[in-house]
Structures are given as C-alpha cells and as structure tokens.
Amino acid sequence: HEATHQLNEQVGHTPPDKWVNEGLASYFGASKLEDYNLTPGKIEAKAYPVWWLGKLRPTGDMQKDFASGRVVPLRALISNSGGPDLDTHVNQWYLGYWSLTHFLLHGEKGKYAEGYRKLLAGKSATLADFERDIGPVDVVQKEWYQYLQGLAGDDVAGNVIVVQ
C-alpha cells in the first residue's frame, strides 16, 4: 500500500486526488501474492480493506446504505465532500476507494478501464474529470454499488467470501 503511494508520487505522477491515491494503493495492497508474483486485481480476502466486506456488506438498498454510512456515496468519494465522517467511518471510505478502483478496472467487463486510465494520465481527478473520462456519476454509482454487493458472497456456513 505505502509503496504504491511512493511509486505514484515519484514515477507514476497520477492525480493527487484522495480517491485515486488511496484507491490505487488499496487496489495493489489487496491484490493476491502467489509464489512471489503479484496479480493485480485478483483479490486477497485477508487484506485491508477487503476484510471489511463481511461487516460492511451492502444490504441491497443503496439509499439506505448511503444514509446510514454503511457505504460512502460515489459523489462523496470522488469530491472528498459529504458522506459520513471520515474519522468515524474510515473503513467505509477505504472500502469505497478500493472497490471503486477495482470496479473501474474490472467491472462491467472492463468498460470503464480505458476512461480510468485516461483519467490517471491527467493532472486531476475531480468530479468533472470523472464525468468527462468515465461517465455520469449517478449511472456509474448504480453499477459500482451492484458490483460492490456482488464482491461478497456467503459460503455454506454463512461466512462472507470474496467472489469474482
């Protein structure tokens, strides 16, 4: 996670916006390491913030989850404004950063990956940049929420598992 921040700063020069910075760091930090090979996007269920999927799993009622602070709304994640208090809901914010990044790269059969990479090559990742390069926040939010809900499944014993 921290190495990703350093690489972004010194080599990648990605936009400094928090949702991009923390999203990429969480994305790589929660990617699976097998036989000394990191597989970006292959989810390590025991990594932070993924391990919070069990406790903070979306209920299926997007508006209720936003209102309760269970899930941070996409507009708040991107603008770093609104949404639940970061001090008391830090895990919800980081689960949002991670899942949004994972969704933009892998969700909807990769339809947002090109736009996300274009955004990463720019100087900023504001709400206007997001809508220009990726799409309307309200449309993307619905798809991302469904994706986040689908990341957590139940096994026979009722334990939350990461599904892909």
Which residues does each PLM region occupy?
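A short alpha-helix capping/helix-coil boundary motif
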Residues: 1-2, 107
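Active-site His/Glu-centered metal-binding helix of metallohydrolases
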Residues: 3-8, 24
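Acidic/His/Gly-enriched intrinsically disordered linker/tail segments
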Residues: 13-163
